[in-house]
């Protein structure tokens, strides 16, 4: 499991796609991983990063919703979908900064 990968995972709201944020050296060794949820609901917020099915190899056009960051146990991860390109991962990190104000 690596930062920038998209996975289907069991979440409290049901199975959904998530983006892994936990840094690489740690993600394979700890029991819980920091993730952010993907959704098809777009609100045009600074806390959203748009992904398209064609460019980002996701099942459908969606946004990464950085207002929905949480941890999931490693056992919750069901199936790897894809991995963001380095450029898109950089944009994700910028969106995280913008959404948290850090």
UniProtKB/Swiss-Prot annotation:
GO terms for biological process: mRNA catabolic process; rRNA catabolic process. Keywords: Endonuclease, Hydrolase, Nuclease, Toxin-antitoxin system. It holds the Pfam family PemK_toxin. The keyword Calcium does not apply. The keyword Hydrolase applies. InterPro entries: PemK-like, Plasmid_toxin/cell-grow_inhib. Its EC number is 3.1.-.-. GO terms for molecular function: DNA binding; RNA endonuclease activity. Forms a complex with cognate antitoxin MazE2. Belongs to the PemK/MazF family. Toxic component of a type II toxin-antitoxin (TA) system. Acts as an endoribonuclease. Neutralized by coexpression with cognate antitoxin MazE2. This is Probable endoribonuclease MazF2. It comes from Mycobacterium tuberculosis (strain CDC 1551 / Oshkosh). The lineage of its organism: Bacteria, Bacillati, Actinomycetota, Actinomycetes, Mycobacteriales.
